[in-house]
Amino acid sequence: MPFGNDPPDYVHLRSNESQMQLITISENSDIPTPSGSPCFNAPARDEAPSVIFIPGKKFQGTFRWWKSRTTMEKLLLPVLLLFCLLTAVLLAVIINTDKRIEAMKTDHATQTEHAGFGDPTENPTKTAEDPRVPPIVPEAPTSPEPEVTTSTEKPKEPEVCSTPGCVRAATHFLNAMNTSVDPCDDFFEFACGQWNDQHPIPDDMYGFGTFAYAREQVRQQLRVLLEQEVVTESESINMARATYRSCMNKTQLDELMTGPLFETLTELGEWPLLQENWDKTKFNFTSLLVNSRRDYGVDVFFQLYIYADSKNTSRNTLFIDQSTLALGRGTRDYYLNTTLFSSHMTAYRKYLRQIAHLLKTDGNLTRSESEMNADIEKIIDFEIELAKIIVAEDERRNNTRLYNKRQIQDLYNLLPQVDWVPFFQSIAPSDLTHLFHNETEIIICEIEYLQHVSELIEKTDVGLLTNYVLWRVVQSNVRYLDERFEDIKQDFLKVMTGQQQSPPRWKDCAQVPSTVLPLAAGAIYVQAHFQESDKHEALRMIMHLRNSFADLVRQNDWMDEETKAVAIEKANSMINNIGYPDVTNDLPKLDKQYLGLSISDSDTYYYIMKKSVVWMQSREFQKLTKPFDKHEFDISPAVVNAFYSPEKNAITFPAGILQPPFFSGTFPKAVNYGAIGAVIGHEITHGFDDQGSQYDKDGNLHNWWSESSLNSFDTRRRCIVEQYGNYTVPKTNFRVNGKLTQGENIADNGGVKEAFQAYQKYVTENGEEPRLPGLQQYTNEQIFFVSYAHFWCGKKKEAAAMQQVLTDEHSPEVFRVIGVLSNMQAFADVYKCPRNAPVNPDHKCIVW
């Protein structure tokens, strides 16, 4: 599942997927996600980054390293060297100091050993005048009240790390932490307060955080690589650069204006909304749906997928699921609560009207504005009726309920308005039409939905049906036109997400190749920005995290031994995809991935995207002739995210997320385990959350739990639902949807616990690490938790925060920190939190 949140869906070109991801990938981005079963979870979405880092030329050796440092790092390194020198001098002085002064120091240490966290007057190292000086945090005991030592022997000063990696990690944290806050009261503010204060949300974004920073860095790097004037031996890489250039060709877009879209409308039989005398006698419902799906990838009234049969993952099969709405998946509340969301629906109405008016003007059409507006009202009213029959996402977590194997002939009874066999034969490649007949198997996710949508279609005028279908096609394709449509969309986004202005065009265009040619774009990125040593280090961490999960299973007292053994076997069977697929290093094999797709600099942007849709769909249908490939690494390496696929039982960590500030081979292990280690643990735990637990080690949907263990799991799961359901989201009056977010919350909780235990085991086997410079008063176990929280630093506009509550299966970032740590006794021990402190409640929810 995803690891974050995002705005509604305003673009159609994406693959469908069942993967659980670290953060939600925005549906209005161009980053693709692996194809998958529609029944499992919402399609991945991607959060819009902001401008942070602009990469320049590469440098070699020490000069390259120094030039790549930030200003803060350059300033901190000389300070660090001076600190080391002064420390050596100080030690020499201490050795020769009078014993009377030594005893006096010992007495003072005894008096201040129990100094409180939040009282600066009792802590001589922290003053009210300098709140940025970190407080002395007592080193972690195993008991909340450590025994007071009376030894007169001076404690040994902790070793401090001075490597570039330590300096860089320390800089990240020093620039983020608000150490005037007691970590036991609000650890999110403690770890992120300064970062959030010093990083306003850019006008071209609805939210900004450390995750968005990483996304933006990758996007900037891709931009530089795609703009290189080079021709390579790889045709697919050349096509990736040609796609970027066509997207950036504003001159051509301005010349074409709405011409390409009018060609589309003509192909589909004209849009009644724009026509004076639309001929309803030419209406053919099946043909309308065929042309929309086959040529433009737009599903209306139902969604069609090809993926592994959930109960026999050796084979691929057809899936049909309920529709999405124009505002995106999970947005039904916007339509159903028109009082609360009146401003949003007003913005949507205006958005539709402005697009229609622009098309009318460009086409020199004569239909009156009043008639057009009347049709627009009917479109919105119809979509409200459609929203009423769509099943809410938080009611779609029982995957067995969603698995209904039928035959195509059964669809004629459920939705008879569609002539199903010709429909499938028409959208499939011509060499595969023989696969579709009355007895062809298909898995239906929502049977009652199809019955209800049939009733809605039956009572709706054919003109309105055509208006709605073509509106969905228009909405999906206006982004490939000139910037007038971007201006219209931006006015809409200002209300829906709080985003104040459109991003520069290159930001969107840099992501387009990752949609059309994800592996080719990823190959460009990996060659320039990913080290093989990091791949090996990530693999070692995965092994450690997997062992840590197995230890948690063995240690728990609520599963029987047989179920424990099956759970551990499933964890040990997980497939690891790290960094990039091997094909990205083999250019001839890479080019074979894109046989049948031809893109050149002479192609218009609109035509490239249309060709890509047709090619993608043909490739998807070909999967029906092949076994399901559980080892397919079908995600662009340039994606900043992580994934778990239940049908593959596979975890995937693209190169894009294996980057600072979340991971580096030069970072201390405490930093890596707290950040990317928690991500790895998160994805492993997805195999054992409320949905992943329904699948076995081979990816098949069947119950492998004993009744008693399943009942115990359900009790613990409900605890998580209730805990998060009681959190009120900042800037809104809404509470977190504990039911919708439970899978991600279970994964967060398990992931951090696994990562912490894995780090503790590392220390046991390898010894304590030196501490971070400037933060040496914090133990490395304390830094582990700072590193985890730092992953989620950031904030959102009010509208975006509201949208997240309604549509996203992830909790807001603050609760991904507070919610997890409130359930970890180890955190309370490390920070010596008193009983019933805000981040150390007596009642804790523990699944894994």
From Swiss-Prot:
It is found in: Cell membrane. The chain crosses the membrane at residues 75-95. Residues 108-161 are annotated as: Disordered. Coiled coil: none annotated. Probable cell surface protease. PANTHER family: NEPRILYSIN-11, ZINC METALLOPROTEASE FAMILY M13 NEPRILYSIN-RELATED. Residues 160-848 form the Peptidase M13 domain. The gene is nep-11. One of its GO terms (molecular function) is metal ion binding. It is an enzyme of class 3 (hydrolase). It is a single-pass type II membrane protein. Pfam families: Peptidase_M13, Peptidase_M13_N. Its cofactor is Zn(2+). Belongs to the peptidase M13 family. Zn(2+) binds at residues 682, 686, 744. Binds 1 zinc ion per subunit. Residues 96-848 are extracellular. One of its GO terms (biological process) is protein processing. One of its GO terms (cellular component) is plasma membrane. This is Neprilysin-11. Residues 1-74 are cytoplasmic.
